[in-house]
From Swiss-Prot:
The active site is at H953, C1111. It comes from the Viruses. The lineage of its organism: Viruses, Riboviria, Orthornavirae, Duplornaviricota, Resentoviricetes. Disulfide bonds: none annotated. GO terms for cellular component: host cell cytoplasm; viral outer capsid. It comes from Rice dwarf virus (isolate Fujian) (RDV). GO terms for molecular function: peptidase activity. The keyword DNA-binding does not apply. This is Minor outer capsid protein P2.
Length: 1116
């Protein structure tokens, strides 16, 4: 989990705000530079006292669990028969608890993968998602939804309205059939019907049944697929015609998982079902959807032609979390009803003990199973494996139909005698070019072998493959012939220059410098002469080996402790090579992260390569077709030069004539039949080798053999060879964290070297002294480094300062609490919030922005993040016009206030009055933050901060810049701004899918945030505050943010605008403020909205007042 000194996205910012035990202190101390090796022991000891207590309690429970259960069973066995009903009730209660736990764990795994897949689709535009909701209370019915946005509803943009269809919302304990009908513009847009007699749901869109789903009841044995939402999408294009698409949950999963069914599909609408068109139109700058009850929709827009995939995936993600929250609420209600029945009868402690212990035992087992453990595995081979290199050769065919000509040293060669006159004994040769257009369809070597091995965790197969890069690359190879010593092939008659017409000779196919290396007794060629592809010198020969670690947690990686040795036999010579295994984290085609060991060794380090010949095996029906006679002109006779091939020089050279167009036809398994030779195009002179040396370091591939210097090469893995590797396992194949980290190897090495002898991560994290020792070892030899660097270096996968692994512990802890609701006072918010926190944690671990690399099919979209749009934006809101107030303000008072994306700002609360002490504290805090404070000043601020009595008022400012059409828009979200006033009046709320409206009184907390939106259409940076309704804040929230009581009569629009501008002025010009920390980050589409939504949804939990220590605690 990334710390605040390395914020990359809004989820990281949210983690700064989360009230997780012991995190705020560590974050604050890292920020203030107070964490060093010297004071680390005392600091962690004080910080983690509570965590040690929790760990000790868990340990004691596990030790005494079996004893407690035995006692409980003994006591229950003493019960009389009159207590049978009581035992039945207890069993019912226990069953409910375990059933909820089982269902929650099942849904957790299901939704986890769904959420992780969704996080792979990050927005590639700066166009936002606008939420809109309509309550089911008819008295509060809104006739229409009008979204007024400047420069949005034009012919340059498309708009989508996305509505969820939640099957879980229609499943309840009622017996009658349930239906939901939504009308748009007088038409039945869609209807959903649930038949309880067979638990089947029917979805109709515009009168057509688009899906039929069999449902499972909540609380019984569930099927996770039943709880995945489907989507109804209305797309309005340039011509104002609305298209209706239905996207079932199955198609969403296929789209996210890159199903083979959709290999060539790139747009989400391609996998959706297009139902029809509607009569809805977009006119006069607004969109209207009339008479829509029970609707929780999202409205998005982007330039025409730009895919809405990422925004729709983000919307779907939020609906997934809503569904889980609803399910959890229903489960808790069910549990409470059973518990009420249990508590209505008098029970002894023994009665209640047994189900509680069983539940605790199950949860502890689940926690243990979900905890990654450090494993040391030794992978060995049972027996000696001998394999011909050719049987594991894999060649990539890189030829295409457009590759028509290959260069070659093949040549026709003949001696001509004149019976009358001279010259005599003239040596003439004609080089040949080869047509390779049919090589694209040739079948070539594509083999590998699995060598059986064993490890401590079971069988480990080693996949072996030989690769020779570029062996069938038209840019890197030529055509040559391999044939036995002394072989001659007659293939055309030739008339020599100036010779009488009756004198001619037979042109013979000449051999290349590689020919004499291939003696017939050593090389079993099917024909005496075979064509082949000749690769350049120094071509590598890679022996590649792969071992899959299926039980590993990919996010935590691993480290190879010891490599093994393999051998290459070449005749009587044996060459030994050491493997070079590395731990690689990769994403499979299904989108799942996996871990494997990969080794690639170039054997030419000991067996150098001067030449490669890939023989195209001649078939029995291969034929060399004779050509017509040809007359040749005299060109460059008797010229000599030299030619170098590899380490050898060939000196006896004679002139010859070049002729093009020698056709080569490919047959199955790369079989070649030479075609008719064309001697009509004589181009230029070249040289031809007539005499040869031998002994070239040549590789020749013939059938299943690879020959080196004429001898077949054999691969051997000696018996007993072993590879030792350390990695982290996840027994449930459902690891606590599932991260995509481009620096996984380095991170895993840090973790393993910290304490490679530990049995598990849990053991390391539960022992403070071990953790301190591990940290200090990591710090050596530069002990002056701060712990923040160590935490950052391991990518936040396991925080050495946080002993409980991952937010799944929080989830399990909540389930444990549910088992005893009378003591814990738990409600469904706790479990829902825990799961949301876990999803956000998993998302930020999986995608650490800034470490991603191109080429990952699941993450390619991240390459197009609109960072340039933000970084190139020159219109900073320096001056803000406030039209209702009739004034303009210059924004900011800090040097690094203007250009940052996230600021944490402190203001003097003046609790100590105006005077030197107040000024001195402000200056001291500023010096600490700027690393300019002395030892005394640092410790003073640290002590005040730890006790949360630092006399300053904190708030956070998050800035997001967009360009919408021709308008530059800056959204500034302030959190921690309320001064303790309350939100007056009543608040109405409806549960997802529920028709009942709940009236909640006494909601006495501030909104927790204020959203200032300013826009500009000019290049000079003059920004103007927008209408307050664009911010999405209500009248109540604006009055609460201003610290004013809401009037008894609703204020006018102009009055609210005046108050809105006053808040903007106060926040942008506040004197005495300074930025404690700022972060340059890229806020992607929807992230600012998501963060704001988190604040809103947690208002009832935290009661945002933000005064005194609350604000400091929040901003920590």
């Amino acid at each position: 989990m990334a710390y605040p000194n390395d914020v990359r996205n809004v989820w990281d910012v949210y983690n700064v705000f989360r009230d997780v035990p012991n995190r705020e202190h560590l974050i604050r101390d890292i920020r203030n530079g107070l964490v060093t090796v010297r004071n680390l022991t005392n600091m962690l000891t004080n910080m983690e006292r509570d965590d040690q207590l929790i760990i000790a309690q868990l340990s004691n429970m596990m030790k005494s669990l079996s004893i407690g259960i035995e006692k409980a069973q003994n006591e229950l066995s003493k019960l009389k028969t009159t207590d049978a009903d009581r035992a039945a009730v207890l069993a019912d209660y226990q069953t409910s608890v375990l059933n909820i736990e089982r269902n929650t764990m099942l849904l957790t795994g299901y939704f986890k993968q769904l959420v992780l897949d969704l996080t792979g689709y990050v927005g590639a535009s700066v166009y936002p998602i606008l939420p809109f909701m309509i309550t089911g209370d008819q008295s509060m019915m809104v006739d229409s939804i009008n979204v007024n946005m400047k420069n949005v509803f034009d012919d340059k943009h498309e708009q989508e309205i996305v509505l969820p269809i939640h099957p879980a919302c229609f499943v309840s304990t009622i017996t009658e059939d349930t239906s939901s009908v939504v009308y748009a513009d007088g038409d039945e847009l869609y209807s959903v019907h649930v038949r309880h007699e067979n638990m089947t749901m029917y979805v109709n869109v515009l009168g057509e049944t688009v899906e039929t789903r069999q449902l499972s009841m909540i609380g019984e044995s569930i099927v996770p697929d039943d709880f995945a939402p489907s989507l109804l999408i209305l797309r309005f294009s340039q011509d104002s015609v609305g298209e209706v698409f239905y996207l079932s949950h199955d198609n969403i999963k296929k789209f996210l998982g890159h199903s083979l069914e959709y290999t060539d599909k790139y747009v989400i609408f391609d996998v959706a079902r297009r139902a029809s068109t509607t009569r809805n139109t977009i006119t006069d700058g607004f969109c209207s959807v009339d008479g829509v009850p029970y609707l929780d929709g999202r409205f998005i827009y982007q330039p025409s032609g730009i895919s809405a995939d990422s925004n729709i995936c983000a919307i779907y993600n939020s609906y997934v979390l809503d569904v889980l929250r609803y399910i959890t609420e229903c489960e808790v209600d069910t549990l409470r009803s059973v518990y009420d029945r249990t508590s209505s009868t008098v029970f002894s402690k023994t009665d209640v003990l047994r189900p509680r212990l069983l539940t605790m035992q199950s949860n502890i087992s689940a926690l243990s199973a979900a905890t990654p453990q450090l494993a040391n595995d030794v992978i060995t081979s049972d027996s000696t494996d001998l394999l011909s290199l050719g049987t594991v050769l894999t060649v990539s065919n890189e030829f295409t139909a457009d590759d028509t000509t290959l260069s070659t040293s093949l040549a026709g060669h003949c001696q001509v005698d004149y019976s009358e006159g001279s010259p005599q004994d003239k040596s003439m040769s004609i080089p040949v070019s080869c047509d390779s257009s049919q090589l694209a369809s040739s079948t070539v070597h594509s083999y590998s072998a699995d060598i059986l091995g064993h490890g401590l965790k079971g069988d480990r197969n080693l996949n072996l493959m030989i690769n020779v890069p570029g062996l069938m690359n038209p840019q890197k190879v030529t055509v040559d012939y391999v044939y036995s010593d002394g072989y001659k092939l007659n293939f055309a008659s030739v008339v020599a220059p100036d010779a009488p017409f009756w004198i001619n000779a037979t042109l013979q196919l000449s051999l290349s410098p590689s020919a004499h290396n291939m003696l017939s007794k050593l090389t079993p060629l099917d024909n005496d002469a075979c064509p082949g592809l000749k690769a350049q010198a120094n071509t590598p020969v890679l022996v590649s080996m792969t071992i899959n670690l299926d039980d590993a947690t990919p996010a935590l990686g691993g480290e190879v402790i010891q490599n093994c040795v393999f051998k290459i036999h070449h005749g009587d010579d044996v060459y030994s090579f050491v493997t070079d295994f590395d731990v690689i984290s990769y994403t499979s085609t299904s989108g799942t992260n996996c871990l494997k060991l990969i080794s690639s060794v170039d054997i030419t380090s000991q067996l150098p390569s001067d030449m490669w010949i890939y023989v195209m095996n001649g078939s029995p029906d291969a034929a060399f077709i004779s050509g017509d006679s040809v007359n040749m002109s005299s060109v460059d006779w008797h010229q000599s030069t030299s030619q170098t091939v590899g380490n050898y020089v060939y000196a006896t050279m004679k002139a010859y004539w070049n002729v093009t167009s020698y056709d080569v036809e490919a047959r199955p398994y790369a079989t070649y039949v030479p075609g008719k030779i064309n001697f009509t195009a004589i181009d230029h002179a070249d040289v031809f080798v007539d005499d040869y040396n031998t002994g070239v370091n040549s590789y020749v591939i013939v059938n299943s053999r690879i020959y080196y210097k004429g001898n077949s090469s054999i691969y051997e893995v000696p018996s007993g060879s072993f590879i030792k590797v350390s990695y982290f396992t996840s027994p449930l194949k459902n690891p606590t964290v599932d991260a995509y980290n481009a620096e996984i190897s380095r991170n895993s090495a840090y973790l393993i070297k910290a304490n490679a002898s530990l049995d598990s991560v849990a053991a390391m994290l539960s022992n403070i002294s071990n953790r301190i020792d591990a940290m200090e070892r990591l710090m050596e030899p530069t002990r002056a480094h701060r712990i923040a660097g160590v935490v950052s270096s391991i990518g936040g996968v396991i925080s050495l300062g946080m002993p409980l692994l991952g937010a799944i512990v929080v989830t399990i802890g909540s389930i444990i609490s549910i088992a005893d609701p009378d003591k814990q006072g738990i409600d469904y918010h706790s479990v829902a919030n825990a799961f949301m926190s876990w999803c956000q944690y998993a998302a930020v671990c999986r995608y650490e922005y800034g470490l991603l690399k191109r080429g990952d099919e699941k993450l390619d979209v991240l390459s197009f993040m609109p960072k340039r749009v933000v970084s190139d934006f020159k219109n900073k809101p320096d001056v803000i016009s406030l039209p209702e107030l009739g004034e303009s303000v210059l924004r900011g008072s800090s040097t690094d206030y203007l250009d940052t994306e996230i600021n944490i700002i402190y203001n003097d609360m003046q609790l100590l009055g105006q005077g030197k002490l107040s000024d001195w504290l402000n200056k001291t805090v500023s010096k600490v933050e700027n690393n300019a404070a002395n030892f005394f000043e640092r410790n003073l601020v640290k002590s005040l901060a730890n006790k949360e009595v630092l006399p300053v008022h904190a708030r956070v400012e998050i800035t997001q810049t967009e360009k919408i059409g021709d308008v530059y828009r800056t959204t500034i979200l302030y959190t921690g701004i309320n001064e303790g006033s309350y939100l007056g009046g009543d608040v109405f709320a409806s549960r997802l899918g529920d028709k009942n409206i709940l009236r909640m009184n006494g909601f006495e907390s501030g909104p927790g945030r204020f959203k200032a939106i300013v826009e500009s259409t000019t290049e000079v940076g003059n920004f103007r505050v927008v209408d307050w309704t664009v911010s999405g804040m209500s009248r109540y929230e604006i009055y609460a943010a201003a610290g004013e009581v809401y009037p008894s009569k609703d204020p006018s629009h102009a009055d609210v605008q005046l108050l809105y501008e006053s808040i903007v002025r106060d926040l942008t010009t506040r004197d005495g403020s300074f930025v404690l920390k700022h972060h340059d980050v890229l806020l992607l589409p929807g992230q600012l909205d998501a963060f704001e939504e988190l604040i809103i949804k947690n208002a009832s939990n935290y009661q945002y007042a933000f005064i005194g220590s609350n604000c400091s605690k929040l901003c920590a």
